[in-house]
Amino acid sequence: MTTGDCCHLPGSLCDCSGSPAFSKVVEATGLGPPQYVAQVTSRDGRLLSTVIRALDTPSDGPFCRICHEGANGECLLSPCGCTGTLGAVHKSCLEKWLSSSNTSYCELCHTEFAVEKRPRPLTEWLKDPGPRTEKRTLCCDMVCFLFITPLAAISGWLCLRGAQDHLRLHSQLEAVGLIALTIALFTIYVLWTLVSFRYHCQLYSEWRKTNQKVRLKIREADSPEGPQHSPLAAGLLKKVAEETPV
């Protein structure tokens, strides 16, 4: 991942103040105090996150790098090798991020997380199979299946009854024609059912691979209740100690 012309998210301004893009952003904000804008993008250019923070406003404490909220409702963790404000993250936010991005590592420091992936149930796929075209195709195929199945069964039964009647009347040509029609009807029905079923099974398999429930396994060293301080907490304590006047 990259952060435009800056390698850090808000809060780590030491390496960003000298860049031209940073100065342009600060001067362009004429309303209120100067602000710092950070845009986190992936390697393919997709915008993943944008944060705007005032430069002259001191931070109240560490905040989650995904939702940019503090530790009021949920404790902040430091599960990867990122330090500073990049190292703090909520467990729920990170699980949602890993689930939506279909990854199991930090996209900044490439640290592999210990995760447990569980496939989502079939009912969720039936409610939301993906794009609108796939949803429309699924609904149409289900309606056609419910309509064609009894129609094919009734048509086949009528053809067989007619073939029996023609055999009793010694009309073998008509009986053979009705039997051939029944076989053709059921062949087309079975082929259409198999093709449609295979197509939707492939869609469900792809959806299942990219839509999984990710559960982050927290190690003792990453937990805020562990015996040792995390790198984030150690850095904050060191910073506070340096800024405290003697």
Swiss-Prot record:
Region (Required for interaction with IKBKG) residue ranges read 121-246
* Stored SMART domains: RINGv
Q: Where in the cell is it found?
A: Endoplasmic reticulum membrane; Lysosome membrane; Endosome membrane; Golgi apparatus membrane
Please name the Pfam families in this protein's record. Answer: RINGv (PF12906)
Region: Required for inhibition of HIV-1 virus production and VSV G protein expression; residue ranges are 56-116
Q: What is its EC number?
A: 2.3.2.27
Q: What keywords appear on the UniProt entry?
A: Cell membrane, Cytoplasm, Endocytosis, Endoplasmic reticulum, Endosome, Golgi apparatus, Lysosome, Membrane, Metal-binding, Transferase, Transmembrane, Transmembrane helix, Ubl conjugation pathway, Zinc, Zinc-finger
The molecule here is called E3 ubiquitin-protein ligase MARCHF2
Record the organism: Homo sapiens (Human)
Q: Which gene encodes it?
A: MARCHF2
